[in-house]
Regions:
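Functionally constrained cores in energy, signaling, and assembly domains
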Residues: 6, 22, 58
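Short, mixed-charge low-complexity intrinsically disordered segments
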Residues: 37-71
């Protein structure tokens, strides 16, 4: 089991923490990359996503501000 945790700040300044569970690492990575793509398209100012294994170890993590990512 793998978990994808998202932390995103919307345009109103509210922070949402979204957690989804996935059976395989491939499914989790697919969701992870979809989250990052959606954040880039929507212009969410701060976004973080992480894939965590069943044992609690981070597999993949990325956090950025769009102003920095656009450079």
């Amino acid at each position: 089991m793998y978990i994808v945790m998202e932390l995103q700040k919307n345009k109103d300044g509210h922070v949402a923490n979204i957690v989804t569970e996935h059976e395989t690492l491939a499914q989790a990575e697919s969701k992870y990359h979809a989250v990052l793509s959606a954040a880039a398209v929507s212009g969410i100012p701060i976004h973080s996503a992480i894939v965590v294994s069943e044992e609690g170890f981070p597999v993949e993590h990325r956090c950025w501000k769009h102003e920095e990512a656009a450079v």
